[in-house]
Amino acid sequence: MGSARDDGELGLLVEEARRLLAGDAQGELDLGITAKAVKAEMVGPPAGVLFGDAAAGSAPRQLVARAQVLKSCSGLLYDALAGVYADLGFDDAVDDEVFRDLVIARVVEPTSLLDVDRILAELGRACASLSTRKRTLRRASVGGYRGQIAAACFQTACATGDMSLVLYDVTTLYFEAEKEDDLRKVGYSKERRVDPQIVVGLLVDRRGFPLEIGCFEGNKAETLTIVPIVKAFQQRHEISDMVVVADAGMLSSSNLRDLDEAGLRFIVGSRVTKAPGDLASHFHWHGDFFTDGQVIDTITPRDQRGTATKSSDPKIKAEPVWNPKTHSRSWRAVWAYSTRRAVRDTKMLNLQETKARAVVTGDKSARTPRFVIVRNGARELDEASLQRARHLVGLKGYVTNIDAALMPATEVIASYHDLWRVEQSFRMSKSDLAARPMFARTRDAIEAHLTIVFAALAVSREIQTRTGLSLRRFLRTLKPLRSATIDINGVIATYPPALNTEVEAILNALQPTGSRH
């Protein structure tokens, strides 16, 4: 342990030795011998006189250095994140410590590649050099890291959830760049920007756990992204049967045909403008009267125009039951009515009508909004379109190729409503993980950045699933708990932070299921 010059230093060394002996790393042999308590005097024996012999003189006084903190770090947070990273199988899939540190730094505080060393230093981790970090990004881009991470995510999802249904959605990430290139192009932006952007597609399971991610040109239509992502996922994991759920933006006849020909089942949102054709029989016999929670199971034409085949015969009161053999040119359509949705739709229509009237009267200048038509150079309110929209409030449609015998209409609706999980994952990646690659310019750098975000999203979703806490609250709880390295008169020791019951519960929840206590 060291040497001591007086009884005080000896007491500190004895205490440090006891702490090491009591540690988990120190083994103990059961010899049946009771250890004898050791006593070390912190103060020397008393002298014979009160003030000593003045004639003898006093011994020179030795100054003892004050205890000082050499460093402190959030090592507990790093260990917790590294444990989840390893539990997901990423250490085995990608044997790269620098990549792991980049992923953990992205979870803790999204920042530039240059600033990663500051984040890792706060976590008590020695950071690799900037050139090593850049080489790691190149390896991630050309070394197949994304495929290996995706394979590990798939194994985790299979072990913890149901892989019979996956959810898909897209988003856009913009760049503050003046010029376009082969990847970053100006296109339809969900954030209403005119900057160059990329389109990112994300596939998740029922829990919102990421399974596949893809990057496309900024001007690529959303409908053209779902098939490449789903087919890549299907080929990577050799899946022949699963249900793909997507919103109405993915609804195109070619997409549905390609998914059906690939042997996949789908559930996509339908546009409300198709309701008059799909529900022609209902409107003929019942008008626009619906009851709250009413569900109508019918058919819808496969082509976009709806002219190839009629959806339903208005003269027949009963809705047709979709059969893939007898209705080879139609898909199954499920329509549901909700009073709550009707109230929300009516409120939105009122706002749109007010805006349209303001534009028509010239009180407000704007691009031609909904329900405004231009006739003979003058703007007019489209009363007919507004009236048709009011007849359809409260309706929501779903298109699928799943037979009613396999999945009832209520389950189709419930499966579609799980789409909020992929939207939540996108919000987490764009806000908590700052997925927008502000500092990446080349395609390889952007792809490597998205691979890190993909792995960080998997770690974040797993933390949220295990602890029940949002990522922000998890970080706010563990980050302030810092271990300290203290120098006490030459004796250097590291002391962990004190843990309360809340933190202990979080750490226990992060452990794999078999090792929790």
Over which residues does each language-model region extend?
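Acidic, metal-coordinating catalytic cores used for nucleic-acid/nucleotide bond scission
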Residues: A221, V245-S254, V272-K274, D444-I446
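Secondary-structure transition/capping motifs at alpha-helix termini
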Residues: L123-A128, G143, A159-T160, R206-F209, ...
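Active-site beta-loop-alpha junctions of metal-dependent nucleic acid enzymes
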Residues: G214-R236
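An anionic, glycine-rich sequence signature occurring as long contiguous blocks
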Residues: P196-I198, C215, R257, G263-S415, ...
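Short amphipathic alpha-helical "interface-anchor" segments enriched in bulky aromatics
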Residues: V412-F439
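Dynamic "connector" segments at or just before major functional cores
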Residues: M1-D182, V194, L203-G214, N219, ...
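Conserved structural-core and active-site-/substrate-pathway-adjacent residues in large, well-folded domains
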Residues: V116, L167-D169, G208, D247, ...
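Basic, amphipathic alpha-helical segments enriched in Lys/Arg and hydrophobic/aromatic residues
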Residues: G2-R5, T442-Q464
